[in-house]
Amino acid sequence: LYIQIAENIKLAPLVESDAADILKAVNVSRASLGKFLPWVEGVNNIESAKKYILERVNSGLNGSQWFKIYYKDNLSGVFAIKSICPDLNIAELGYWLSCDAQGNGIISQVITKASQLLTSTHVKFIEFRCLEKNAASIKVALKSGALLVDVIPNFLVADNVLQSLNIYRTPVK
């Protein structure tokens, strides 16, 4: 089961057997991903990559859907509807890309099509949560039309800096 996003971009459900490919993608990009994603440090062998996958696909969070991103037929990252808050009709998105796939507008194209994944829900808003120094993720959120709606100060230390968590939100298109 694939969801075609563009000629060279497709999504498929993230599954435990993706562990080796996930580990490879993380290893290629460990330095850059690790600056903003605390889980990166703990994904360092096949078992921990399986654990990373299973914790996400079995999160039990409402509306959670996790996908691997293929770019030119290589597993190049992960995209998720991390959860849906039914009371507020908000879907939180999450994503990461390996270094070799960055700069191709992949995530922006995936987000443009993400509304198709939400058609059977009552979601009215998409939410992005980005650490304040994560310029690439903030750029993606802003490019989608999202606006800064909240800041959680002193959220966590990343890249040796105590950072706030910025929350961006945009209506589903």
Locate predicted features.
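Conserved GNAT-fold acetyl-CoA-binding loop/helix
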Residues: 34-54
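A short helix-loop-beta-strand connector motif used in the catalytic cores of GNAT acetyltransferases and
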Residues: 40, 54-67
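Acyl-donor (CoA/ACP) binding surface of acyl/acetyltransferases
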Residues: 1-21, 25-32, 68-173
